[in-house]
């Protein structure tokens, strides 16, 4: 009876391929994350009277408020509309990130990305 395993442990070639695939996936995720960080999304409320722009790092880049809203003097309504637009912008960023990174991971949630 000869040695069936010739040159090492069975399955180790597959392990090497898996490691290469994981490294490739990590590179793709890092590239995608960098691209996402540079992407901006816009959300509005009040029929476009409030506009919020956020980037892929979940940072608010700008907020524009129609002057007529300020003239009305309804601060509470203005605050609510800003909050709605900010929350919508953040949700858009999260959805965009989840969608793009999900294409790489096949839907597996990987912490830190």
From Swiss-Prot:
One Gene Ontology term, aspect cellular component: bacterial nucleoid
InterPro entries the record matches: YbaB-like_sf, YbaB/EbfC
Subcellular location: Cytoplasm, Nucleoid
Keywords, sorted A to Z: Cytoplasm, DNA-binding
Major localisation: cytoplasm
Region (Disordered): 1-44
Biased composition, class Low complexity, residue ranges: 15-26
Recorded GO MF terms: DNA binding
Compositionally biased residues, Basic and acidic residues: 27-38
One Pfam family it belongs to: YbaB_DNA_bd
Subunit description: Homodimer.
Family from the record: Belongs to the YbaB/EbfC family.
Function: Binds to DNA and alters its conformation. May be involved in regulation of gene expression, nucleoid organization and DNA protection.
NCBIfam families tied to this protein: DNA_YbaB_EbfC
Protein name as it appears in the record: Nucleoid-associated protein FMG_0513
Species annotation: Finegoldia magna (strain ATCC 29328 / DSM 20472 / WAL 2508)
Organism phylogeny: Bacteria, Bacillati, Bacillota, Tissierellia, Tissierellales
